[in-house]
Amino acid sequence: MLRIMKYLSKTEIGQLLISLVTIVGQVYFDLELPSYMSEITRLVETPEIQMRDIWISGGKMLLVSFGSLVCAVITGYFAARVAASFGQRLRSLEFRKVESFGPSEMHRFSTASLITRSTNDVTQIQMFITMGLQMLIKSPIMAVWAVCKIAGEGFEWTLTTGIAVVVLLCAVGILMALVMPKFKAMQRLTDDINLVARENLTGMRVVRAYNAQDYQESKFEDANAALTNTQLFTNRAMSVMMPLMSTIMNGLSLAIYWIGAYLIEDAGATEKLTLFSNMIVFSSYAVQVIMSFLLMSMVFVLWPRADVSAHRVMEVINTEPLVKSGTRSRGLTVAEAKQAGVITAADAADYRDDLELAGRIEFRDVSFTYPDSREAMLEGISFTADQGDTVAIIGSTGSGKSSLINLVPRFYDASAGAVLVDGVDVRDYDLKALRDKIGYVPQQSFLFKGTVKSNVSYGDRPGEPEDVPMLDASRASGRKAEREMLKADENRALTAQEENRVEQACDVAQATEFVEKMRGAFDAAIAQGGTNVSGGQRQRLSIARAVYRNPEILIFDDSFSALDFKTDRVVRDALKAYAKDATKIIVAQRVGTIMDADCILVLDDGRLVGKGTHRELLESCDVYRQIAQSQLSEEELSA
């Protein structure tokens, strides 16, 4: 828990120091009250006392109480500010860290767990700062101060108070030993229930299609019951604490009065009033001592959950992704590439030496093994794609097609060999610079909540800051925060040129026809995940998004599978015309999609078993020939 406090800002530390001062002030005022109570008791018992003196002492008590109230309000105000801004910072740190994660890190944590860590766990930390931190600071100060006040006032009373404190600490220790292991289990079980709920909501259509509602309900009930039983155990254990604290506190007061009664009975007439006054004061201070330990016990209730949550949050923040960004921001120039032997002098003859290579991809004896696997997914892959080339990849399911193209944008790094883009090893590139060169269309098309326009133009833009300033959570909330977010969206409004590029990209992807039929056309609303459009429409918008970037390299991971043959052909022809200078890598299952490619790579069990044009592979590669014969007619094969 203490490690996460290093993320507090200087302003927040200053606010906590102010809270510390006001807590000390509050303790001082609280411990002054028994003194005035003793004085009023003495005045009441004193003959010939003036009522005015009692009113003065009572007025001082009211002022002291008001001072305590003011200090408590100031402490609560600054604690709430610190908790809100600190929680915001932790969520932002987690989000930005998760954005740097690759598939291996996502697999390690799981999406459901990451959501829980950035919401529920951060809330637990905020709750501790708002309430627990005050108690953690206040309780020891109050305990020490109150003990100093009562030291030497009476051996019997002091011994009784000490016994009560020991009993209290033993009870709290036993309870904490019982419940602390359960708090970590509760966070894990919360992850599980979020996972089941998210899986059910995401796969709702499949659940209904297979009439698996009862099965899903059973899975949810199992997870829900496990979480509920754990919560019941901790709640039952913690429910003993408050009655136990009250019993100890009331028992101590009773013991003090009982001992005081015997002391007063045996005292002389002149000492009775002094003993009675001391008993009242001692009782009040003893209750303050018990209250301080009671507050400390409340800290023990909040601390375990916050500590577990802080550990889980720090686990995310401190996780270093396997794929680390390099420093290079550009590829080689023609002169550099010629000197490095990346291209030959004949290839460089038609270009100026100061021009940069663009869209050139080279795999040099690349092998790849997934982090948690022992078997290689790819072995000894070598090929080159020059600017403007169309390279297709085909093979059976599980042959490594998607794994191969995932190495280009560095979703994973090669286990052996090297992947070069524009003559530079991709591991040397700054990740942002590398991915700015690439337009990527994933196998499972995904659209974001927004509009057609915002989805097609998705991504960063030249001149925009990489780190967007965070909204100040301590100053903006509710509708004000919503207005700030809307204002930020308005500031990202497309220029006329960008809107024209959106329309061009949709034309290339053959999406304009259905987009214009939607309400609002390019401003039509898109639901999260693109659930309000068909699979083919999602794919076309995903293709448009990649084309909009005007990248050096276009990667299509089986991105034409949801298109009919006619649309598939039209889209590929449009891409050939519009993005003729871009290098295109196409993963496909349909031979008809890749027949016109400049080079076709045939993968089988992670190995490159064929490389050439469609006609060449029909003659030289058995695997390709079998795939083609299973899909094409005799006339198409002989054409």
Residues covered by each model-derived region:
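An intracellular "coupling" helix at the cytosolic face of ABC transporter transmembrane type-1 domains
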Residues: 10-13, 100-104, 120-129, 133, ...
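Transmembrane helix-loop-helix hairpins at lipid-water interfaces of multipass membrane proteins
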Residues: 10-74, 78, 151-156, 265-276
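Residue-level recognition of pore/gate-forming positions within transmembrane alpha-helices
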Residues: 23, 65, 135, 139, ...
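ABC-type nucleotide-binding domain
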Residues: 334-639
